[in-house]
Amino acid sequence: MSQTANQKAKRIPLGKDASTKRRLSKVRRHFRLRKKVSGTPERPRLVVNRSARHIHVQLVDDLAGHTLAAASTTEADVRAADGDKKALSAKVGQLIAERAKAAGVEAVVFDHGGHGYHGRIAALADAAREGGLKF
């Protein structure tokens, strides 16, 4: 059974649709960033993971492979806060700054995980800076 010209035109090869390209582009950006960014005990990596609904942040010492502190919008005190996703991201930035200070961390290397530096990512970074972290 052969396909008509119209059916052939509509076929998209596997892995070539828009969502796959977008995801792979993000992965490539993150790999490029990770080649340059590494966390140490004195200056750990501030890793940001963003999904459509939540944002997660970790302080990672790459040499030892340990997470020093973490914060997320899934925590009860952040969920109780009012505001949009950008405001909740700023709250997470304040939380990670407090927890970093408690862990004895003053300066961090920012790893935005292949995401663009705007919106929720920028709000989180600005709040962490206001909380006393040096990027």
From Swiss-Prot:
It holds the Pfam family Ribosomal_L18p. It comes from the Bacteria. Residues 1-23 are annotated as: Disordered. Disulfide bonds: none annotated. Coiled coil: none annotated. One of its GO terms (molecular function) is structural constituent of ribosome. This is one of the proteins that bind and probably mediate the attachment of the 5S RNA into the large ribosomal subunit, where it forms part of the central protuberance. This is Large ribosomal subunit protein uL18. The gene is rplR.
